[in-house]
């Protein structure tokens, strides 16, 4: 039977734990995006570091394989909605952690108006009220692809799917209040 794949952390912790500027920046992001803990933030920061590391390596590389990898990296970031279709590798270096956090399912559910607050968006996702592309996703940190963005709705089995649900009426009234 082969050995199981080794479990690895998907995030890197900060090199120094008590840098005030970093702590203040993290606190603002934690509140704005309603993250559960710093680990969620560090996971997305590590993802961004990896994209940037690959871009720096590919900027210096020459050859046919480097061209293929450049195209693959840009295509991946385009599918995630982090970069436009006509982006170049220098655009990867200008990405910020906010760009990645804006692609989380939790943030998109809130911005689409399916929840009143970003915290309620997290609760709706965890409780299985939200589906993406016909599939219930229970992970608020799921990075939504650009083509999946239009398929985010309430789950068919969720009470929120009914227009007459009391909470949904409150959300609709809040939307109309903002529009006026």
UniProtKB/Swiss-Prot annotation:
Signal peptide: none annotated. InterPro entries: Ribosomal_uS4, Ribosomal_uS4_arc, Ribosomal_uS4_CS, Ribosomal_uS4_euk/arc, Ribosomal_uS4_N, S4_RNA-bd, S4_RNA-bd_sf. One of its GO terms (molecular function) is structural constituent of ribosome. Pfam families: S4. SUPFAM superfamilies: Alpha-L RNA-binding motif. Keywords: Ribonucleoprotein, Ribosomal protein, RNA-binding, rRNA-binding. This is Small ribosomal subunit protein uS4. It comes from Thermococcus onnurineus (strain NA1). The gene is rps4.
